[in-house]
Amino acid sequence: DSEWDGEPIEPEPKPSPFPPRPDPWPDRVREKPAEYAKRQKIKVKLADGKARMIQHMMVTSFWHPDGTPMSAQQFMELLFGKLPEFFNDEAELRALWSLPDTRAKLLERLAEKGFGKEQMAEMQKIIDAERSDLFDVLAHVAYALPPLSREDRASKAKVEISHHFNSKQQVFLDFVLSHYVTVGVEELDQEKLTPLLRLKYHNSIADAVADLGKPEEIGQVFAGFQKYLYQPQIQANP
């Protein structure tokens, strides 16, 4: 056909009367809503002028004494205001936390004031420190120190432990530290010593004594090594 002038032009599509459906998440986010929400952080500046980053959480387990819910930021501000009643400075916090008996008394006093195990565990989540020590919660809220994972803390402490304990003691302390890393600071409680010895030595306390010395010596080793987990130089090099 001499008059043919090419393929017919398709008509332009008519615009939809409905707006385009929005992407359910931002472009860079392709994870479940709960995971995305967990990553959202907000900056909280406390009375010392230093900022802390906390997870944005819609629901927390914090409550005012009158039973009304409390936000994570309000709880952090309350804890920050109360901590000077328990220790005067960072050095005193480290000293109290470095021994099982004084640490237990500190935790007991905190619980009496409304800062119990459940609340402290919740605060661990909020500052994204679930793999850290409860010490890190207190040090972060009180002094804005960056949390350090239990694994890193244990790894750095082993250097000091190798200089202060014999080989058999080091083997046992490595075993203790593995439980500390996996479970938490409660594995360093004094009442956990005997269960840990039984676990390590297959229920034979006699074997433990043969390796580690008299019971009082074992107790001193167990309590004495813990200060190396909380030295300032460990925190200074996260």
Which functions belong to the PLM regions below?
Residues 6, 10:
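Acidic/histidine-rich catalytic neighborhood
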